[in-house]
């Protein structure tokens, strides 16, 4: 069983104006502070390339993608990257993937975003076969792939993104974990976890522990709740309130929202943990005790970003 320290990861690279070298330096610093798990999303930078560079400067911290978008990257191309990274940092990569959103895949990449969960199921089947077995013979709706390279394998854990109930169920069926993002904790406990376990049971995986649910949580290191809520509003409304998958999830979680609107205060209050280091640590411990398997802690800067990142990282490392 993982220790509490191993169950709490730290998000880096959230700044879209951040240079790659800055993200690498944060990963190196986080390991130096005692952090066991790093998570990084796929913004305008390539996460796996950053991880490859960071892996040469670190020795133990686990590196998790949250997430790599599936539609723009063929599973064989992703497998090539993963094989290289696993050779540089054996056993340290946790590969989180997901279908992303129509406004991104169609609006930015110009690709079709049809049947995202069907596409994700096929993607994981091809990717796992190539990585874990070195061979695949797959003929489906989205992929026709025949490969046989048994000498190049890497049993890298494959986690998938999940917001809706069907996505959590799919994660339980096919993945090595589910990655949530901005999901209220009651929704995760009452909808996400049961669906994850249902999927695992349907796939005949009930003999072993179900795949872990990694819960994304927002943290503001301030005792001023108004500042914390303002930071939460800015983050949610800038990144997520205009995306239908999030609006649907918020509504099903009991926080009705509409596309492009301001997030309700009660939703932001539910999502943001605030206080000094001791108060935040207590709340994170409570979340782990509630039934969540792991936490992905995302700092909401208030005043001094560098200082707050340092303090939060130290708090996590001291679990």
Question: Model segments located where?
Answer:
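Active-site-adjacent structural elements that line small-molecule/cofactor binding pockets in enzymes
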Residues: 1-319
